[in-house]
Amino acid sequence: MASQQAPAKDLQTNNLEFTPTDSSGVQWAEDISNSPSAQLNFSPSNNGCWATQELQSLWKMFNSWLQPEKQTKEQMISQLVLEQFLLTGHCKDKYALTEKWKASGSDMRRFMESLTDECLKPPVMVHVSMQGQEALFSENMPLKEVIKLLKQQQSATRPTPDNEQMPVDTTQDRLLATGQENSENECNNSCNATEANVGESCSGNEMDSLLIMQKEQHPEHEEGNVVCQFPHGARRASQGTPSHHVDFPSAPTTADVPMEEQPKDLSRENISEDKNNCYNTSRNAATQVYSGDNIPRNKSDSLFINKRIYHPEPEVGDIPYGVPQDSTRASQGTSTCLQESLGECFSEKDPREVPGLQSRQEQLISDPVLLGKNHEANLPCESHQKRFCRDAKLYKCEECSRMFKHARSLSSHQRTHLNKKSELLCVTCQKMFKRVSDRRTHEIIHMPEKPFKCSTCEKSFSHKTNLKSHEMIHTGEMPYVCSLCSRRFRQSSTYHRHLRNYHRSD
């Protein structure tokens, strides 16, 4: 638990801070060896275990801080609650908060009654634009919920040919849906500044902008893509080094992005081989239009994330890939590009040829498969198609012409055609087995003395499982209980037969 600057006596953290040392990873900077609560009777650690020393240090640290011999449980809980509230980062002025804590006399109830929302930081809002629908959402809202709300807004206010070129304004109802009405003016000003300056650096308290483009295909032509762009905002730039600033594009209106325009995405050949640096070395052929011949005919959304950090030297920024623009501008300087694609599923490997097996024609799957929103359920799509597109049974026995699906099944079957049939044949009853282990297990039946004997009644059994079932008679154990009539059974076969005969209708 990281320490915060707090009152001297009430919070017990005025002179406490973490200092890393060689002997312990986390220790208090103050000397706690003289504290009466820190004098604990720990047995000396002979093995020098670092984990034991660390636990002892933490035990002494918390006893010295909370002082359980002097404070009540409520006082200690209040200290922990206030410390955790300071660690969340929502507090705007920690010093003012500690002053209120001292003024309340370390009483948590009085302290909470005096608190207002003025001590909290303003919420961070994100401007989202998708197919002409715009709204403000909290940065912690899931992306699925954002897309769902924007689709509902689009269905409620579907544009007509007359007003198709007009952008849809952010409504107050959408702000209420995010629970952040109090930051409407600040977020709207930031959105307007973003739309006015495309490709230029951001300044002030402008928020992050999320651009979502979703295209719906016709059954004969094309498949729609969802292109999401998460540029870095000025808020994240303030936390980094001052050597560069962060630039992000504005959300285009419906006039900039026609509804019938083909979706664009990054080609796999245009990404540099050095994936660690994610440096894009090609601008001329950076986009690729997916035609309807290479994309499945059902509707699916693919997610494309493109983050770009610009250096402050060029005056004109690059046009972000994945966002359609009316005209292209020559980019100056260099840019570091982090590209993550969740819609790539390619199969380019040739089928394996197994010598001695039946030949077959196999259709290659080389078209890209776009994953939908529920991409976790679609992940095994490639292996599923590979497995079920081939013939049902591939492996053929050359002696009896039997077909098998797996090689291990064919290998097990071929043992029956071996010349060493004496190893697989029971001498007593002339029964043939596929494995030598099965024959040995079977031969126990023909033995005059059975190896497993009951210690109570000295009855012998050929198998150990039969002995265990027999011993339940002496112990009275009945592990199988019917949940419907509470009858108990000794064996599972008897239990299942009871269910079939008496509780089939239930």
Swiss-Prot record:
The gene is Zscan4f. InterPro entries: SCAN_dom, SCAN_sf, Znf_C2H2_sf, Znf_C2H2_type. It is found in: Nucleus; Chromosome, Telomere. It comes from Mus musculus. The lineage of its organism: Eukaryota, Metazoa, Chordata, Craniata, Vertebrata. The keyword Signal does not apply. Residues 37-119 form the SCAN box domain. SUPFAM superfamilies: beta-beta-alpha zinc fingers, Retrovirus capsid dimerization domain-like. This is Zinc finger and SCAN domain containing protein 4F. Its main location: nucleus. It comes from the Eukaryota. Transcription factor required to regulate early development. Binds telomeres and plays a key role in genomic stability by regulating telomere elongation. Acts as an activator of spontaneous telomere sister chromatid exchange (T-SCE) and telomere elongation. A zinc finger (C2H2-type) spans 395-417, 424-446, 452-474, 480-503. Keywords: Chromosome, DNA-binding, Metal-binding, Nucleus, Repeat, Telomere, Transcription, Transcription regulation, Zinc, Zinc-finger. Residues 1-24 are annotated as: Disordered. GO terms for cellular component: chromosome, telomeric region; nucleoplasm. GO terms for biological process: telomere maintenance via telomere lengthening. Up-regulated in blastocyst outgrowths and is detectable in a mosaic fashion in ES cultures. GO terms for molecular function: DNA binding; zinc ion binding.
